[in-house]
Design a protein with these regions (language model features):
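Hydrophobic transmembrane alpha-helices of multi-pass small-molecule transporters
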Residues: 1-98, 217-219, 227-319
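Membrane-embedded alpha-helical segments and adjacent helix-loop junctions characteristic
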Residues: 8-9, 36, 53, 66-177
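Membrane-interface segments at loop-to-transmembrane junctions
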Residues: 10, 123-128, 179, 189, ...
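Alpha-helical membrane-protein architecture signal
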Residues: 49, 132, 136, 140, ...
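Transmembrane alpha-helix interface/packing and boundary motifs in multi-pass membrane proteins
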Residues: 55-63, 140-150, 191-203
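Re-entrant/interfacial helical elements at transmembrane boundaries that shape
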Residues: 69-73, 151-166, 187, 200-217, ...
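Membrane-core helix-loop-helix motifs of multi-pass transport proteins
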Residues: 171-253, 257
């Protein structure tokens, strides 16, 4: 977002952050004086105005994004929309700590290139046939997106997928239509599978955790890590198979012969990674332990003498 704001400033000559800063303040001050629309309470109108004010500041980056997020913590108590305790609890609830812990673990996986090794080992084992290569990239992308952000997964996998696509474009055996179909299927499959993987675990994407918090707060029913996976994983696997089949057999059928150069690209990436470092091994062990606690806490708790595990505590422990 920041780069887009800078780009708009350069082409327009306007100071976008200053305009957003003043625009958000002026808009909110004027809107506060208006009567709420029919069917909306006064408090509801105030919350809506504050939300729009924050949206203006976020889009223009009038102040740092994190600072804008703290606006309700200041204004809600002043406008009697909630106490500092009730508002502040939303900034430090279980959902927030689960997101934080999962994010830190994901950063560690990226920091030591564990995600690259997992992806390359997965793709290497599917062979060199085009349809299998697409499936391998989709499987690796979906698995990684279960634990790190969809964007990080796609950014990491994209250059490798492009290398494979360009290799088959230039040296693969097949007509131009099949070569184009392979590249299209590979790129779309990579993107779709990252989104699908993100829905398979609670920490796959932040919206999952936000839904968990909202559901528990409003309906009093707790969703733990295993509960989510019992629904998300079967749906995710089904969607992966459907998307792979639609891309490779229906929308962009690819009639090509595999190219041994694909294996060489993957081997080169693995060679670049070298042997697993101590830090990478430790990260893998922490990841496996944390995921095991999330999934198997129901089996472990009876042996803990009354101690209770929760997903947020496990996430912080792993972090």
């Amino acid at each position: 977002v920041g780069s887009k704001v800078v780009f708009l400033q350069k082409i327009s000559g306007l100071n976008i952050p200053q305009i957003g800063l003043l625009g958000g303040l002026v808009f909110s001050l004027l809107a506060f004086q208006l009567e709420p629309p029919e069917g909306l309470s006064g408090d509801g109108w105030l919350v809506l105005v504050i939300a729009l004010w924050m949206a203006i500041w976020w889009m223009t980056e009038a102040v740092p994004i994190a600072v804008t997020a703290l606006v309700p913590l200041v204004l809600f108590p002043i406008l009697n929309l909630g106490t500092i305790t009730s508002v502040g609890s939303s900034y430090a609830g279980k959902a927030v700590f689960l997101t934080l812990g999962g994010f830190i673990i994901g950063l560690a996986i990226q920091r030591w290139n564990l995600h690259s090794r997992i992806a390359m080992e997965t793709v290497k084992r599917v062979g060199i046939e085009p349809k299998g290569v697409i499936g391998g990239f989709m499987l690796a992308s979906a698995f990684l997106s279960m634990w790190i952000t969809n964007t990080a997964t796609t950014v990491m996998m994209l250059p490798i997928a492009l290398s494979v696509a360009l290799l088959l474009q230039s040296e693969g055996e097949g007509d131009a239509v099949s070569k184009a179909a392979f590249g299209t299927s590979l790129m779309l499959g990579l993107s779709y599978s990252a989104s699908i993987g993100g829905m398979m675990t609670l920490i796959g994407t932040s919206t999952n955790v936000m839904f968990k918090g909202y559901f528990e707060q409003n309906y009093g029913l707790e969703i733990d890590f295993l509960d989510w996976m019992m629904v998300g994983v079967p749906i995710g696997i089904t969607l992966l198979v459907i998307v792979w089949w639609m891309l490779t057999f229906v929308l962009f059928p690819c009639e090509m012969i595999g190219h041994k150069g694909i294996g060489k690209i993957i081997d080169k990436k693995l060679d670049d990674l070298g042997e697993m470092s101590n830090a990478e091994i430790r990260t893998l062990l922490v990841f496996v332990l944390t995921a095991s606690l999330w999934i198997g806490k129901g089996l472990i708790e009876p042996f803990l003498g009354g101690l209770v595990l929760n997903d947020a505590s496990i996430a912080i422990f792993g972090a």
